[in-house]
Regions:
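Non-transmembrane, aqueous-exposed alpha-helical and coiled segments at domain scale
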Residues: 1-263
Length: 263
C-alpha cells in the first residue's frame, strides 16, 4: 500500500518471511537491535506514525552523536516502529531527539563517556494516561505502560542506529545501566502541590512536554520512621548531599542536576 507518506521514504527496505523471530534474529546479526524483540517497521506502520507529525519524512530532527548521524523524521519513525511506539506518542520521541541534539546538551560526551549516564525522559501534560506513561507506582520500572517502555526505547534505538552509539565501540561505558534500554516516566502532577516541571520551565499545563535529563541511575531512599514533613525533608537533604557518581568532581559537582522523585 503506497501512501503520500510512504511514497517519499528513502530508507533501505528488506524482505523477510512472516516468522516474527526472523526479524529479531536479523536485528541482532546486523547490530541494529538492542537485544530485545522488535516489531517490523512496515510501510503501513511507518505511514501511521508519520501521519502523527506535520513534518515531512526528510525533515531533519537533529544530528546525533557520536558519529553525527543525521536523524530525519523518517529514520526516527523507523526506529519508533521497531520499538512499538504508537503514533500519538511519536511527537514526544521527536521532541526528545531534538532536545538531545541541542549543542548545549552535550550529547557527544554522554554517548562516548565511560560513565553509565543516559537520556532519562520526564513527561508532563494531559496525554500521560492516554499514552501509557507511568507516573504512579513503579513509574521508574515495572509498571508496564506502553508509552514509558516504547518512547524511551525509540530514543535509545535512534542513538544506536542513527548516532552510532554502541557499547564497547563508540560508547566506552564500563558497566552501563538498565535504563540504557530506555527510561521514560511522567510527573504525578495531580498529586503535587507545586507547579509541574514543565510549568517551571515556561510551558502551559495543557501542553505535552518531555524533558531530557542525563541520568546515571536510581538511588532508592526509604523512610519508615519520620512522621513530619520537616523530618522527611531533613532526611532527603542529608541523603542527596552524599557525593554519588561524579558529584565529587569539580566542576561537575557545582553544575550537575539531580532529579528527586517523592511519593
Amino acid at each position: 500500500v503506497t501512501t503520500p507518506e510512504t511514497s517519499r521514504l528513502t530508507a533501505e527496505t528488506i524482505e523477510l518471511d512472516d516468522d516474527p523471530e526472523a526479524l529479531f534474529v536479523l536485528s541482532l546479526e546486523q547490530g541494529w537491535g538492542d537485544g530485545a524483540p522488535i516489531l517490523p517497521p512496515t510501510d503501513e506502520r511507518i505511514a501511521r506514525i508519520l501521519a502523527a507529525t506535520p513534518h515531512p519524512p526528510d525533515h531533519i530532527v537533529g544530528v546525533l552523536p557520536p558519529r553525527n548521524g543525521v536523524c530525519t523524521v523518517e529514520l526516527a519513525a523507523v526506529n519508533a516502529a521497531m520499538a512499538g511506539v504508537e503514533p500519538a506518542a511519536f511527537p514526544l520521541v521527536l521532541a526528545a531527539l531534538e532536545a538531545i541534539s541541542a549543542p548545549e546538551w552535550n550529547a557527544f560526551a554522554l554517548t562516548t563517556t565511560t560513565s553509565s549516564v543516559f537520556p532519562m525522559l520526564i513527561a508532563n501534560g494531559p496525554s500521560r494516561d492516554a499514552l501509557g506513561i507511568n507516573y504512579r507506582a513503579g513509574c521508574l520500572g515495572g509498571a508496564a505502560g506502553r508509552g514509558s517502555m516504547t518512547i524511551g526505547r525509540a530514543v535509545s534505538l535512534c542513538l544506536r542506529n542513527v548516532g552510532g552509539q554502541k557499547a564497547g565501540e563508540t560508547s566506552r561505558t564500563v558497566f552501563g545501566q538498565p535504563a540504557r534500554f530506555g527510561l521514560c516516566f511522567g510527573e504525578w502532577e495531580e498529586r503535587s502541590p507545586w507547579p509541574s516541571l514543565s510549568q517551571r520551565r515556561g510551558f502551559r499545563a495543557d501542553q505535552d512536554v518531555v524533558t531530557v535529563h542525563g541520568g546515571k541511575g536510581t538511588f532508592p531512599l526509604a523512610d519508615v520512621n519520620n512522621d513530619s514533613a520537616e523530618d522527611l525533608a531533613y532526611t532527603i537533604a542529608k541523603s542527596i548531599a552524599f557525593p554519588l557518581n561524579n558529584w565529587y568532581l569539580e566542576p561537575t559537582g557545582a553544575t550537575g542536576q539531580l532529579v528527586l522523585c517523592i511519593n
